[in-house]
Amino acid sequence: MPKMKTNRAAAKRFKRTGTGKFMRARANKSHILTKKSPQRKRRLRQGTAVDAINVRALEHMLPYL
């Protein structure tokens, strides 16, 4: 059986933690930042875990991560 390919687009966007969760960056942090409060921009800097509903799809896209 041939090796499975890693989806390179997903590999650049998601990282796996030591406990096996997938982490992602938050949206809305690239432009139009003047109207967003400093607290909101600070929260957007931190990553967050991927929802459980999407984990199975990510495991197929990232078999070796």
From Swiss-Prot:
Superkingdom of source: Bacteria
SUPFAM superfamilies assigned to the protein according to its UniProt record, in alphabetical order: L35p-like (SSF143034)
Family per similarity comment: Belongs to the bacterial ribosomal protein bL35 family.
Disulphide bridges, residue numbers: none
Organism expressing this protein natively: Syntrophobacter fumaroxidans (strain DSM 10017 / MPOB)
UniProt-recorded Gene Ontology molecular function terms: structural constituent of ribosome
Any one of the GO CC terms: cytosolic large ribosomal subunit
Identification of the protein by name: Large ribosomal subunit protein bL35
A Pfam family this chain is assigned to: Ribosomal_L35p
InterPro entries, sorted: Ribosomal_bL35, Ribosomal_bL35-like, Ribosomal_bL35_CS, Ribosomal_bL35_sf
Keywords noted in UniProt: Ribonucleoprotein, Ribosomal protein
Protein's UniProt keywords contain Mitochondrion: no
GO process annotations (BP): translation
